[in-house]
Every structure is written in structure tokens, then in C-alpha cells.
């Protein structure tokens, strides 16, 4: 029974990097090489949400240490984000991230201009045609 428990523990520990990093990295490269834009949006949404989750963990690290099932909950949540059957990352991005950015005037809606100064626009001005800069 000890060997089985050791195996399960190792499997549980290894699942995190595979689900949270390796599979998303692989799928992101495949998406970038495909002609469709839908998969690009799914994986860009994933990396935005995963980055936010990682930053939140850094900030709340001392609190999270007291939650014994945190790693398992995070693993299940990230699996929901990455599995193509669920498209959780796109769902969270569209329902939460995009709406919050619109609400705070960071993103322009399709019919109106931002009500507040767009700080991201001042940092990263939009360039027509997305031309590359040569150095």
C-alpha cells in the first residue's frame, strides 16, 4: 500500500507541471502555427488567467499555505481552463477579464470610447497595420 500511495503522490505532484505548463506550451505553439484564430484566443486567454492566478498566489502565499487542498483545487481549476472540451480560459476571459477591463475603461467596447484615460494605450500605443520595427 505504501508503494501505491507513493505512486499516487508522485502522479499528483507531476500532474501540475504537465497540466499547467507543458500541455499549454505545446498547445500554444500548435495554435500559433494553425491558420485559425480561435485557438490563438483560447491560449492567450489561458496565459492571461494563469499569470493572474500565479500573481495572486504570490501575494496570498501565507494564506494559501493554510489551505491543505489548495494544490488539488488549483489543479482541477487549471485542467478546466486548458481542456478543449470546456474552453474554460476563453469563458473566464470573456465573462470576467474583458468585462472588468471594459468597466474600468481599459478596453473600448465596440460602440463607445473609454470613459477613463486608457493607461495601456499610453504605454503601448496602437500601431496601424501592426508593422514590425527593424533595428
Curated annotation (Swiss-Prot):
It comes from the Eukaryota. This is HVA22-like protein d. The gene is HVA22D. Predominantly expressed in flower buds. One of its GO terms (cellular component) is membrane. It is a multi-pass membrane protein. It comes from Arabidopsis thaliana (Mouse-ear cress). Induction: By abscisic acid (ABA), cold, drought and salt stresses. The keyword Transmembrane applies. The chain crosses the membrane at residues 11-31, 42-62, 63-83. Belongs to the DP1 family. GO terms for biological process: flower development; hyperosmotic salinity response; negative regulation of autophagy; pollen development; response to abscisic acid; response to cold; response to water deprivation. Its main location: membrane. The lineage of its organism: Eukaryota, Viridiplantae, Streptophyta, Embryophyta, Tracheophyta. It is found in: Membrane.
Amino acid at each position: 500500500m505504501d508503494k501505491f500511495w507513493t505512486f499516487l503522490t508522485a502522479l499528483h505532484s507531476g500532474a501540475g507541471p504537465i497540466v499547467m505548463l507543458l500541455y499549454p506550451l505545446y498547445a500554444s505553439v500548435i495554435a500559433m502555427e494553425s491558420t485559425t484564430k480561435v485557438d490563438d484566443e483560447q491560449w492567450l486567454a489561458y496565459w492571461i488567467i494563469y499569470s493572474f492566478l500565479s500573481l495572486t498566489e504570490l501575494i496570498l502565499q501565507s494564506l494559501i499555505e493554510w489551505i491543505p487542498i489548495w494544490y488539488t483545487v488549483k489543479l482541477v481549476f487549471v485542467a478546466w481552463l486548458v481542456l478543449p472540451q470546456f474552453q474554460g480560459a476563453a469563458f473566464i476571459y470573456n465573462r470576467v477579464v474583458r468585462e472588468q477591463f471594459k468597466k474600468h475603461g481599459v478596453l473600448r467596447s465596440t460602440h463607445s470610447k473609454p470613459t477613463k484615460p486608457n493607461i495601456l494605450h499610453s504605454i503601448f500605443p496602437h500601431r496601424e497595420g501592426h508593422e514590425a520595427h527593424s533595428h
